[in-house]
Amino acid sequence: MVALRRAVALNAVAIARLQTRALTARTRSLALASSQYRAYKTSSRQHAFHSQLENTPTPSAFQYQKPPTVENPQTLVEKIAQQYAVGLAPGKKIKAGDYIALAPHHCMSHDNTWPIAKKFLDIGASKIHNNRQVVFTLDHDVQNKSEANLKKYSLIHEFAEKHGVIHYPAGRGIGHQIMVEEGYAWPGTVSVASDSHSNMYGGIGCLGTAVVRTDAASIWATGQTWWQVPPVAKVTFTGILPPGVTGKDVIIALCGLFRDDQVLNHAVEFAGGESLPIDDRLTISNMTTEWGALAGVFPVDEMLISWYRGKATTNAMFGGSSKDRINHKRVDELEQNRLEADPNAKYAKELYLNLSTLSPIVAGPNSVKIATPLKNLEAEDIPVNKAYLVSCTNSRASDIAAAARVFREAAKENKDVKIAPGVNFYIAAASLPEQEIAEEAGDWQVLRDAGAQVLPAGCGPCIGLGTGLLEPGEVGISASNRNFKGRMGSTSAKAYLASPEIVAASALKGKIAGPGWYQKPEGVEKVIIGEGSGDYVADKALSIEDALDKLINEADALIAAAETSEGAKEQAASPTAAEGEESLTEILPGFPEKVEGEIVFCDSDNINTDGIYPGKYTYQDNVSVEKMAEVCMENYDTEFGKFAKAGDILVTGFNFGCGSSREQAATALLAKKIPLVVSGSFGNIFSRNSINNALMGVEVPRLVERLRETYKNDTEKPLTRRTGWKLVWDVRRSKVIVTEKDGSSWEQKVGELPANVQEIIARGGLEKWVKAKIDA
């Protein structure tokens, strides 16, 4: 055994030496190696931070220095979550994968507040655990003046007054914008919302993530909910944005170029974006939701500190509703106690994007994963019927100013500048304070004079509510965040996403177009992206370090296998050893040992919550179970209801249930009497809603691939098909048995269903589980 250890050790050392020599040789010729990763060279003055200049010497230009080592290192996301985790064992450092009890700094809800309140009351709660933790903002259906909607708003107001909850009325602004501008979302804290775009808070260094309605009710009642710390991906920005390129172009590029679920169900930490304005960061973080991430967090840097200093000074001089939360004392504390990722923090993956190589980009139609350079779409002369400068993503004062600039510059050539004939241009500020800033600057009036139609500060057409929805066959271009089929109107309409200036230019010209501000930098031929940090030497050194770690682990495994081989042989020869013995999962009372049914197959990836349950029904609180079953999957396939039957097992592609936090995406499938959903992978927020509402789900990528292989030559390609295949999920044995149409069958091991999840589902969902705990 000593000889074996020595041989393995010598082998590892030899390989390490060879790879180290390769690194040394690469480092000595750095000037040649790194040049291919530069975006462009120029002799003109560069407006950039010192560290970003092309020829600035840095230590890494001469040799790679390994970052200092911290014991049990944590990412920024893990550090922030650590501060808001309750009940941890002494000395416990949380890491990705851990389940924790999370007590967020703030929990925001919007028009879904009343359904949450009903859940809160139904579980037997009578008092909000911490009324300073909770914020209500009415923002989604603010144009709806029906008696039913006004009554709901009145009930929310009365509930807030009774319990002393901070609340903002309809028309004040979009909840996520209020959370940021009023200082509820704060750097280094955790703020959640029962809305999927709470990721936006990451733009100011706050860990913002979505919860669902039942979670919110639990937070109201107990101050906390459960949360699994996600794997963390690090995204490094290199270079600086050229003029005419915005934060919206950055996030569209990330969604479209890294479109293979690289960050699905991850939290993202951004680095290297020191030059990005805060409004651009808010846009980028906001749409990390569409990228598939659970959070998108920027670091606290000088740009952010300066931004808060400005707001604190304004509050000190003129007062303001946020003065108790945004003031110099609090900014001082923030500056002195910045949370940062440990230098040797471990990330699930690392990606980079060279900002200098970006150009204006448009997403669509009807998908954020289709990203096309603006110049390509301009060449197609795509007519536009409706344009939208709305949403929490891009309707702040800076966005309105950018749109107004388009019309101001056009007015230099033609004083009477108007929106193109046949185009409707809708504008709604992210909040009243942002609208007031735009009004004082004259930008709001410029857009109105050009013919823009003003909507109240709120979500409106972004969520498919109110005035200006897309009609069948129409084309729309929006500065919002989501262009799923049917979300902004008709399922036969086409929706594109773009920056505010592109939206304004398109409204002006009557077709998808830009204002002409972008000038391609010399030498830029393509967008530079990749895995790693974008620093060739550092990435190469880290890859060698990973290789050494892998060798050591393999050596340990080889030694352990050799040391135990005799014992293993003896055990295998023992008559008591049961061949194929399998561990069995304990099944709790009330939970089925097996779930079985015929497979109905929806062969699409990224089926989103709008596809599962249309947004136009989301804020109708009295929709019957029968109606929910009728409209289930309507935006994905209008024929779904004809194919799917009670008791069927729905099998879908990858990333099923991405999109919003609406719980009806789960309850509509239950209304359709579908007991189990099988997919290649699930969006995290759908998984959370499923568990909370007692819908079972299991990931079986092999089944999806097998079905696709079987039907790959089918020329019809229906969105939904009955397969004649049968599936049995043996929960006790943690496996699925699939019987294909020809009678052949096969098995696949799946993850064990833990007891706590069984208990919630057996109780009929989290709401009933919490009620049982309270009653006990």
UniProtKB/Swiss-Prot annotation:
Query: Cofactor(s) for this protein?
Result: [4Fe-4S] cluster
Molecular function (GO) terms for this protein are: 4 iron, 4 sulfur cluster binding; homoaconitate hydratase activity; metal ion binding
Enzyme class, spelled out: lyase
| Chief localization | mitochondrion
Entry keywords, A to Z = Amino-acid biosynthesis, Iron, Iron-sulfur, Lyase, Lysine biosynthesis, Metal-binding, Mitochondrion, Transit peptide
PROSITE patterns, from UniProt?
A: ACONITASE_1, ACONITASE_2
Gene name tied to this protein? LYS4
Family to which this protein belongs: Belongs to the aconitase/IPM isomerase family.
Give the metabolic or biological pathway.
Amino-acid biosynthesis; L-lysine biosynthesis via AAA pathway; L-alpha-aminoadipate from 2-oxoglutarate: step 3/5
UniProt name for this protein: Homoaconitase, mitochondrial
Q: What does this protein do?
A: Catalyzes the reversible hydration of cis-homoaconitate to (2R,3S)-homoisocitrate, a step in the alpha-aminoadipate pathway for lysine biosynthesis.
Q: What is its EC number?
A: 4.2.1.36
Could you tell me which residues form the transit peptide?
1-24
Catalysed reaction(s)? (2R,3S)-homoisocitrate = cis-homoaconitate + H2O
Q: Which organism is it from?
A: Gibberella zeae (strain ATCC MYA-4620 / CBS 123657 / FGSC 9075 / NRRL 31084 / PH-1) (Wheat head blight fungus)
Please share the entry's free-text remark on the cofactor: Binds 1 [4Fe-4S] cluster per subunit.
Domain of life from the UniProt record: Eukaryota
Q: Where does [4Fe-4S] cluster bind?
A: 392, 459, 462
Location relative to the cell: Mitochondrion
